[in-house]
A protein has these predicted regions:
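Sec/SRP-type N-terminal targeting helices
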Residues: 55-59, 72, 102-129, 154, ...
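Periplasmic alpha-helical coiled-coil/stalk elements that build and connect Gram-negative outer-membrane
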Residues: 7-10, 131-245, 334-337, 341, ...
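Short segments within alpha-helical structural elements
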Residues: 128-129, 136, 190-215, 353-408
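Bacterial Sec-dependent N-terminal signal peptides
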Residues: 1-41, 408
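Bacterial Sec-pathway N-terminal export signals of envelope proteins
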Residues: 25, 29-78, 101, 109, ...
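A small-residue-enriched
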Residues: 45-103, 240-307, 311, 317-318, ...
Length: 408
């Protein structure tokens, strides 16, 4: 933001301008006084209830779990009927009924594999839920920041309008040049565009939250954040706790169990397959009937099946190790970022609380030590510093949201 105004001689107008600037600055102060309520919990709970995306994930998980339990029963029974008429009369009639079944060990292991796959499906649903709620929380954090910016820019826009109107009046009375009026008008246009840009971003964030909420409109006018929690003192121990509680890692661990149970199923598929049934053959003069038994020995069909299953286990374990490494590195980066941002915020707030530059600038201006142009430029620097503080507050909340996403 840039304020570019030349000196103004109209004392009444100067007082109104300075008064407007003081109101603008005082409005910024509350932006960083946080509430102690659960700031986004209500919105996140509502999104969890209304989200069509989560509903789709839920239905998909149910279908997947049903599919995992499909095919665990024995094969269908087989019935054969034959009628063979003779060349010289008479006919032979055949009948056969048989039931094939796998070795009992295979059914047991298939059932355990299906149970493990169903647990994995539930954990995947929890992981997807965490990702969706984290996205919603990020939108809320960005929305608070843009709400605060909109409040700040609205005040500054009022000031820009007052300055532009004052210059227009002075120009009509011959006390200002057209160039000075154009500068004031350009400053007003810049502030209008900044406010429109922020309001557009706010509408986009609200639209995104509404979509995440299943089409139900979301309203949030907060302009401040909750106080932040203290970072853990023992980072390494905390990373282990975070990993243990993170549903994404629970899903990866379960995928390893699924792969291991797949090895057991593959081994059991190398066991013989049996069939039992009834067979009958009848002619006009004679009839034969009795029980028939069969066995199928899988000599070639399951070749490399166990080897493939073991490779799946190795791949799942490697994926887990890679995810653990990336997660730890990401958390360490976010942890250090939070520490640095917290220090930056403390330094900003300490300077603002102790120095009260707005009052010092005002006294210097009213005492004749600063021209209005110098006063406005100094005040602009003060506003820009507050914007940086707001951005730092936002960045800290975004980093913390990702750090503690596993708690959602």
């Amino acid at each position: 933001m840039r304020i570019r105004i030349n000196n103004i001689k109209d004392n009444a107008m100067i007082r109104r301008t300075v008064s407007c600037l003081a109101m603008c600055l005082s409005a910024v102060m509350p932006l960083f006084a946080g509430n102690t309520d659960g700031q986004f919990r209500k919105i996140l709970d509502e999104i969890e209830r209304n989200s069509t995306t989560l509903a789709v994930y839920g239905k998909s998980t149910e279908a997947q779990k049903i599919g995992n339990r499909t095919g665990l029963a024995p094969e269908n029974p087989e019935i054969e009927l034959g009628y063979l008429p003779g060349i010289h009369g008479g006919a032979r009639k055949d009948i056969g009924i048989s039931q094939s079944f796998d070795f009992p060990t295979l059914y047991s292991r298939k059932g355990k594999l299906a149970d493990a796959q169903n647990v994995s499906a539930d954990l995947q649903l929890r992981s997807r839920r965490m990702d969706l709620l984290l996205e919603a929380e990020r939108c809320c954090i960005e929305l608070v920041f843009n709400n605060a910016l909109a409040a700040l820019y609205s005040r500054q826009l009022d000031n820009a309008k007052a300055v532009a109107d004052a210059y227009e009046r002075k120009f009509r009375h011959g006390d200002a040049t057209r160039i000075e009026c154009n500068k004031a008008a350009l400053n007003l246009t810049n502030m209008e565009n900044e406010l429109k840009k922020v309001n557009l971003e706010r509408r986009q964030l609200l639209s995104r939250l509404t979509m995440l909420n299943g089409g139900v409109p979301v309203e949030m006018a907060d302009t401040s954040y909750n106080p932040v929690r203290q970072l853990p003192s023992d980072f390494r121990a905390w990373v282990l706790e975070a990993e243990a509680a993170n549903p994404a890692f629970a899903y990866l661990r379960q995928e390893i169990e699924v792969a291991k149970k797949g090895v057991g199923v593959s081994k059991a598929m190398g066991l013989p397959k049996f069939s039992v049934g009834y067979a009958g053959e009848f002619t006009p003069d004679e009839g034969w009937q009795g029980v028939k038994l069969g066995v199928s020995i899988p000599l070639w069909e399951n070749r490399n099946r166990v080897k493939h299953a073991r490779a799946e286990v190795a791949a799942a374990e490697q994926a887990m190790d890679d995810a653990r490494l990336q997660y730890s590195a990401r958390l360490e980066f976010l942890f250090e970022q939070c520490r640095e941002l917290t220090g930056n915020i403390s330094r900003y707030e300490s300077v603002f609380e102790k120095n009260s530059n707005d009052e010092l600038l005002y006294r210097a201006f009213t005492g004749g030590e600063l021209s209005l142009l110098d006063y406005l430029l100094e005040l602009e620097y003060y506003f820009n510093s507050y914007e940086k503080l707001m951005q730092t507050q936002r960045d800290l909340r975004l980093a913390l949201a990702e750090l503690y996403a596993y708690e959602l």
